């Protein structure tokens, strides 16, 4: 962003309408292309590549785009002309692709400047471990044990394009840029009936910006409702000795409390409400009653239907009781498990037993969903029986082995925090046997003959880092294997979901 600020120096009078003129500057396209290419190289595993834009970028195309933007009628191609000359559609789609890249970079400028100004004078703490997805689970293990219900919400996408434009309208005060954005977006999406649209996709950075702006608007309204919905906790009711005119006493007590003890007013807000958003979904965990959870469900449905004009079915908001239902969260099936614990207490000559119940977060592996993903990618059938990977038989033995080892270790590292490892061992078994069958098929041999010729050392590559470390810590005994089966290890180097974990 510092590179852009070197080219963009604005006075106070032009800050409200400085975006639109940037579309007609050639150096902005160069900076946008260079910035986007560097971001793709740094985050190649997270963002998609826009190969068409990278290959077809040139200064000549930029000059043609600028000339056409001076006369927007030249960017409009009737459908009859598309049937006669499909090349016109390909050319204009390429123009809209480059404009989308530029629009994403330009509109991010005021957001970045506003964000940078808010951090001035503040010293931010860097916690690299919190960047991992697995940093969420230790937090939930500490918090979810105090909750009763979880609201599982599937965030809907806006159906009409005008919803996206109106959302940006609250953030961007440049009317000309919004009108141009609306024009390009509608022209691009009007060609849904033509095959040329399937070969071109908008820039992922642009789509990510639209999605985040849409979610930001939704969450700002939700947080406003969250602050307005604070209510008195049940532990504060002990100060009232009588139940006559109960709510009147609450109001009078609050007036006295605010006047005399303003610093302790936070005690009367309900802190047991946590919101987590992930992968197009969000969960709202709370200690409320079923009546209040139904109210929150009603709020979500009406918020999307009335404010965002999106048809949102009530079935997309599920109320899960953690003690009975499983919560699908980040590839795990999470629930609360009651562990009875008996403690013997000795007091002088008398001894007695105390029954305690510990509530613990139980994270299970969705074995059926993962087997379905493996079957979809031809690693096994729908019943979980391993089959050979026919499309990999043209590769070398080392490449085949490295592919299977990499997939096996990724899954093992991600699901290493599960409460029971039985399903994880089953997945590893499927991948190991699939690897052996693939190599045996390549060498035109049977599995038994192939293993007899190479020995069991071939499968030692599948040992994960967890197995290697724990085998050095614990001695080889029945008790050690049982402890290894129960232990949880969260790997903090996992920053995103891989394809097999993302099985929805």
Swiss-Prot record:
Pfam families on file: Intron_maturas2, MatK_N
Annotated Gene Ontology cellular component terms: chloroplast
Keyword annotations from UniProtKB, A to Z: Chloroplast, mRNA processing, Plastid, RNA-binding, tRNA processing
Cleavable signal peptide: none
Biological processes, Gene Ontology terms: mRNA processing; RNA splicing; tRNA processing
Primary residence: plastid
Heme found in the keyword field: no
Keyword Chloroplast: yes
Subcellular location: Plastid, Chloroplast
GO molecular function: RNA binding
InterPro entries from the UniProt entry: Domain_X (IPR024937), Maturase_MatK (IPR002866), Maturase_MatK_N (IPR024942)
Disulfide bond residue pairs: none
PANTHER family from the UniProt entry: MATURASE K
Family: Belongs to the intron maturase 2 family. MatK subfamily.
Role summary: Usually encoded in the trnK tRNA gene intron. Probably assists in splicing its own and other chloroplast group II introns.
Protein name per Swiss-Prot or TrEMBL: Maturase K
Primary gene name: matK
């Amino acid at each position: 962003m510092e590179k852009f600020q070197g080219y963009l120096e604005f006075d106070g009078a032009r800050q409200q309408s400085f975006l639109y003129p940037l579309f007609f500057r050639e150096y902005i396209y160069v900076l946008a292309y260079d910035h986007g290419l560097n971001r793709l190289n740094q985050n190649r595993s997270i963002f998609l590549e826009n190969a068409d834009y990278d290959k077809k970028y040139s200064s000549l195309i930029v000059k043609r785009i600028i000339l056409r933007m001076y006369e927007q009628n030249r960017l409009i191609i009737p459908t009859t002309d598309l049937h006669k000359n499909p090349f016109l559609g390909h050319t204009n789609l390429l123009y809209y692709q480059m404009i989308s890249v530029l629009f994403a970079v330009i509109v991010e400028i005021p957001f970045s400047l506003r964000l940078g100004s808010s951090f001035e004078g503040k010293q931010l703490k860097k916690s690299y471990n919190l960047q991992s997805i697995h940093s969420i689970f230790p937090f939930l293990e500490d918090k979810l044990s105090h909750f009763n219900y979880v609201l599982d919400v599937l965030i809907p996408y806006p159906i009409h394009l005008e919803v996206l434009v109106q959302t940006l309208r609250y953030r961007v005060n440049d009317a000309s840029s919004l009108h141009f954005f609306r024009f390009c977006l509608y022209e691009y999406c009007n060609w849904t009936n033509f095959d040329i649209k399937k070969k071109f996709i908008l820039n992922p950075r642009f789509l990510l910006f639209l999605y985040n702006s849409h979610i930001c608007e939704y969450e700002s309204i939700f947080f406003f409702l969250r602050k307005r919905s604070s209510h008195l906790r049940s532990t504060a009711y002990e100060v009232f000795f009588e139940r006559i005119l109960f709510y009147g006493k609450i109001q009078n007590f609050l007036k006295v409390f605010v006047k005399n003890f303003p610093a302790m007013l936070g005690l009367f807000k309900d802190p047991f409400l946590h919101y987590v958003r992930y992968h197009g979904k969000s969960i709202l965990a709370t200690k409320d009653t079923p009546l209040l959870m139904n109210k929150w469900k009603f709020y979500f449905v009406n918020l999307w239907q009335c404010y965002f004009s999106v048809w949102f079915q009530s079935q997309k908001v599920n109320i899960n009781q953690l003690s009975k239902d499983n919560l699908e969260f980040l590839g795990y099936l999470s629930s609360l498990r009651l562990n009875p614990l008996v403690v013997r207490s000795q007091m002088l000559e008398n001894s007695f037993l105390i029954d305690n119940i510990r509530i613990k977060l139980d994270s299970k592996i969705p074995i059926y969903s993962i087997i379905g993903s493996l079957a979809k990618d031809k690693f096994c059938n729908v019943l979980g029986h391993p089959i050979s990977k026919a499309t990999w038989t043209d590769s070398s033995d080392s490449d085949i082995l490295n592919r299977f080892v990499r997939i096996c270790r990724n899954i093992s590292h991600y699901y290493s925090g599960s409460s029971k490892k039985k399903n994880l061992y089953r997945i590893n078994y499927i991948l190991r046997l699939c690897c052996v069958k693939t190599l045996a098929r390549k060498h035109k041999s049977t599995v038994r003959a192939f293993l007899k010729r190479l020995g069991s050392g071939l499968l030692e590559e599948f040992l994960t880092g967890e197995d290697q470390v724990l085998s050095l810590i614990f001695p080889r005994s029945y008790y050690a294997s049982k402890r290894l089966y129960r232990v949880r290890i969260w790997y903090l180097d996992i920053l995103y979901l891989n394809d097999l974990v993302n099985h929805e």
